[in-house]
């Protein structure tokens, strides 16, 4: 809950800058930052689109450990760029996220890269035995997918 509140506060602060077009707001995040972007969409804030690169998918929970309901509908467009062999976000986690997004009527898409683990955009990631390794194809393809995603929604 605290993380989601901080994301909302940061987003509200950002929208107050004169340079920001409030009708063209988006968020991207990598790993934990991907979770942050998803949690911002889950909050119901008026953000046009979010992109998660090899993110974490668990929904915000209360201090009691009980999952929060959050908004009943997600209006943000969502792009999830996922390494299928990511040990931090398993295929089961990916399906649970897809089910959550469907239940909230979100406009979403998941691009899963086969034989790709966590941190696939980080050229210095080289712990293949732990599932953390760079993949040039997934890195370049995911970046282009993000650019295409934002060009369509903006």
Feature locations, PLM:
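N-terminal cap/leader regions of alpha/beta-hydrolase-fold enzymes
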Residues: 1-154
